[in-house]
C-alpha cells in the first residue's frame, strides 16, 4: 500500500455511520423526481429536492430535451471555445440575460464551474474578494483559486462586512460575493445594505442566484429583482439544476465583463459544453416559469403553509424566508439518526453537517416544490414530529 492509500485508509467516518445503520447518502431513486419517489424499494415523500418549480418531471421539459437530442445528437464533443457552441446555447444565453436584466450571459456545464471559473479569473494579487462566511462551497473554491487577497465577514453581519471593506486598498478592485438565498439556512442576503456599502467603498457585487431563480422576484427573476436592485448588482450567477429542471449554470453581466470571461474563464474554455438535451430542457423550463405565474404562486402557498406548520409544531427553523426550511438538531449523530427515522416513516430529507455548517448548527433540510400538496406537507410534518420526539429533540 502506498503512502496516499495509507493516509486515506484512516478515513473511516462513513463506515462508522454505516455500522450504526444511519448512513444517509447515495440512495438510489428509481424513476422521475417529483413530490413522491421510489427510493431503495420504498415509496417516500420527497422533501429533499431543489426542484422548486416542480418541473423535473414535466412532459414539456422532457420532450424539449428529446427533440434537441434528435436534432443535435447526444453531446457537443468539445468546448464552447472551439466546436462546442450550438445555436441553442446562444439562444438560451440571450434569453437568460434578458430574464435577469443584464447585457449578456454565458452558459457553463455546471453551476459549480460557473463560480469556480468566474471568481478565480476576475481578480489579481492587488485585488480583494470579500465573502459571507456561509457562502456556497463553489464560491469558496473559486476564491481559493484566485490570486487575490481574501476576506470573510460573519454571516449577514453588515457591520463586519464594512470592517472588511475598510481593510482594503481604496484603489483596488473589491469584489463582494454573496449567496442571494443561503442554501442551508434559507435566509436572504441583506442586499440593500450590501449595495449601500458597494457605493460607499467603490466595490463590485456578484450574487449567486442558485436558490433564488424561479423562486423570488417577478416571474421568478431572483433575489436581485425581489429587492429591486438588479442594476446595482454587477454579476448574477444562476444554475439550471434547480428551478430550470436541468444541469448547468450561467453568469450574466455587462458586455465588458462577459467579454473577459468568455476568453479567460478556464472552466468555460476547457470544459465540454452543455449537452443539447440539458440546454433545451433549461430553455423550456425558463419559458414555462415565465408563462405560468400560477406555478410561483403555488410554490409560495406551499412554502408559507409549511413554515406555519413547522413553527406550530415547535421546530427551530431559524431565519428562513424561502422554500428552504432548516430543522435544527445541533448534533451530528442525531442529525443522521433523525434522517433515518424520517426515511423509515416515508419522508426523504437532507442531513446537513460540517463542513456544510458549523458543528453546533447541524440540521435537517426540508425543501418545498410548487407541486407539493397540503396533504403531503401535513404528512411530512407529522412524521418529522414523530422522528424528532423519538430522539427527545422536540
Curated annotation (Swiss-Prot):
Pyridoxal 5'-phosphate binds at residues 111-112, 183, 211, 239. One of its GO terms (cellular component) is membrane. Pathway: Lipid metabolism; sphingolipid metabolism. Keywords: Acyltransferase, Lipid metabolism, Pyridoxal phosphate, Sphingolipid metabolism, Transferase. Disruption phenotype: Abolishes sphingolipid biosynthesis and leads to cell lysis. The keyword tRNA-binding does not apply. SUPFAM superfamilies: PLP-dependent transferases (SSF53383). It catalyses: L-serine + hexadecanoyl-CoA + H(+) = 3-oxosphinganine + CO2 + CoA. Its EC number is 2.3.1.50. Pfam families: Aminotran_1_2. PROSITE patterns: AA_TRANSFER_CLASS_2. The modification N6-(pyridoxal phosphate)lysine is found at residue 242. GO terms for biological process: sphingolipid biosynthetic process. Gene3D superfamilies: Aspartate Aminotransferase, domain 1, Type I PLP-dependent aspartate aminotransferase-like (Major domain). The bacterial ceramide synthesis pathway operates in a different order from that in eukaryotes. Furthermore, phylogenetic analyses support the hypothesis that the bacterial and eukaryotic ceramide pathways evolved independently. Belongs to the class-II pyridoxal-phosphate-dependent aminotransferase family. This is Serine palmitoyltransferase. It comes from Bacteroides thetaiotaomicron (strain ATCC 29148 / DSM 2079 / JCM 5827 / CCUG 10774 / NCTC 10582 / VPI-5482 / E50). The lineage of its organism: Bacteria, Pseudomonadati, Bacteroidota, Bacteroidia, Bacteroidales.
Amino acid at each position: 500500500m502506498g503512502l496516499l492509500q495509507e493516509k486515506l485508509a484512516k478515513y473511516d467516518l462513513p463506515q462508522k455511520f454505516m455500522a450504526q445503520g444511519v448512513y444517509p447518502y447515495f440512495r438510489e431513486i428509481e424513476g422521475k423526481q417529483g413530490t413522491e419517489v421510489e427510493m431503495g424499494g420504498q415509496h417516500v415523500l420527497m422533501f429533499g429536492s431543489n426542484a422548486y418549480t416542480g418541473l423535473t418531471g414535466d412532459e414539456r421539459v422532457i420532450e424539449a430535451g428529446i427533440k434537441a437530442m434528435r436534432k443535435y445528437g447526444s453531446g457537443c464533443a468539445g468546448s464552447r471555445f472551439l466546436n462546442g457552441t450550438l445555436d441553442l446555447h446562444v439562444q438560451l444565453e440571450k434569453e437568460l440575460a434578458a430574464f435577469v436584466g443584464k447585457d449578456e450571459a454565458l452558459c457553463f456545464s455546471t453551476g459549480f464551474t460557473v463560480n469556480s471559473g468566474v471568481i478565480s479569473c476576475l481578480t489579481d494579487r492587488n485585488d480583494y474578494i470579500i465573502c459571507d462566511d456561509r457562502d456556497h462551497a463553489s464560491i469558496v473554491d473559486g476564491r481559493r483559486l484566485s490570486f487575490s487577497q481574501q476576506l470573510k465577514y460573519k454571516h449577514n453581519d453588515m457591520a463586519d462586512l464594512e470592517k472588511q471593506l475598510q481593510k482594503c486598498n481604496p484603489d483596488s478592485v473589491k469584489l463582494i460575493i454573496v449567496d442571494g438565498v443561503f442554501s442551508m439556512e434559507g435566509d436572504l442576503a441583506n442586499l440593500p445594505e450590501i449595495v449601500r456599502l458597494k457605493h460607499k467603498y467603490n466595490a463590485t457585487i456578484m450574487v449567486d442566484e442558485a436558490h433564488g431563480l424561479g423562486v423570488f422576484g417577478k416571474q421568478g427573476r431572483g433575489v436581485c429583482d425581489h429587492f429591486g436592485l438588479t442594476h446595482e448588482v454587477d454579476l448574477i450567477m444562476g444554475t439550471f439544476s434547480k428551478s430550470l429542471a436541468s444541469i448547468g449554470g450561467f453568469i450574466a453581466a455587462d458586455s465588458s465583463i462577459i467579454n473577459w470571461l468568455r476568453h479567460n474563464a478556464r472552466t468555460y474554455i476547457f470544459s465540454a459544453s452543455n449537452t443539447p438535451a440539458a440546454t433545451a430542457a433549461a430553455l423550456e423550463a425558463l419559458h414555462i416559469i415565465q408563462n405560468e405565474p400560477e406555478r410561483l404562486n403555488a410554490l409560495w402557498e406551499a412554502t408559507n403553509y409549511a413554515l406555519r406548520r413547522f413553527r406550530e409544531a415547535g421546530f427551530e427553523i431559524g431565519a428562513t424566508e424561502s422554500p428552504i426550511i432548516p430543522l435544527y438538531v445541533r448534533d451530528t449523530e442525531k442529525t443522521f439518526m433523525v434522517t433515518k427515522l424520517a426515511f423509515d416513516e416515508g419522508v426523504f430529507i437532507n442531513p446537513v453537517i460540517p463542513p456544510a455548517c458549523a458543528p453546533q448548527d447541524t440540521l435537517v433540510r426540508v425543501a418545498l416544490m410548487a407541486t407539493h400538496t397540503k396533504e403531503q406537507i401535513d404528512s411530512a410534518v407529522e412524521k418529522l414530529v414523530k422522528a424528532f420526539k423519538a430522539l427527545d429533540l422536540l
